[in-house]
C-alpha cells in the first residue's frame, strides 16, 4: 500500500473517530486510534502513517514518536482534509 493512500485512509479514520476541539479542529486521542479494530486492520504501521501525515502537514501532534500506553492521551489534530 502506498503512503499517500494510507494518509488518506488515516484522515477518514480521524473523521470517523474524532471530534472538534476548542479551536474547531478535528482531533482524536492516539489511544483511540491505536485501539480501534478497524484502524488495527487498516494500518500495518499506524505510527509510520502518522509520521508521514505529520511530515506532509496534514496532522499535528506533540512529540516525535508515539508509543502505545505512554502516549494514549496525545491529541492527533487534523490540519487539512
UniProtKB/Swiss-Prot annotation:
The keyword Transcription does not apply. Keywords: Acetylation. Disulfide bonds: none annotated. The gene is ABRACL. The modification N-acetylmethionine is found at residue 1. This is Costars family protein ABRACL. InterPro entries: Costars, Costars_dom, Costars_sf. Belongs to the costars family. The lineage of its organism: Eukaryota, Metazoa, Chordata, Craniata, Vertebrata. The keyword 4Fe-4S does not apply.
Amino acid at each position: 500500500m502506498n503512503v499517500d493512500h494510507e494518509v488518506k485512509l488515516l484522515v477518514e479514520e480521524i473523521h470517523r473517530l474524532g471530534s472538534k476541539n476548542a479551536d474547531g479542529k478535528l482531533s482524536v486521542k492516539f489511544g483511540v486510534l491505536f485501539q480501534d479494530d478497524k484502524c488495527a486492520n487498516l494500518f500495518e504501521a499506524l505510527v509510520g502513517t502518522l509520521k508521514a501525515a505529520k511530515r506532509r502537514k496534514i496532522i499535528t501532534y506533540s512529540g516525535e514518536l508515539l508509543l502505545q500506553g505512554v502516549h494514549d492521551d496525545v491529541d492527533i489534530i487534523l490540519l487539512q482534509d
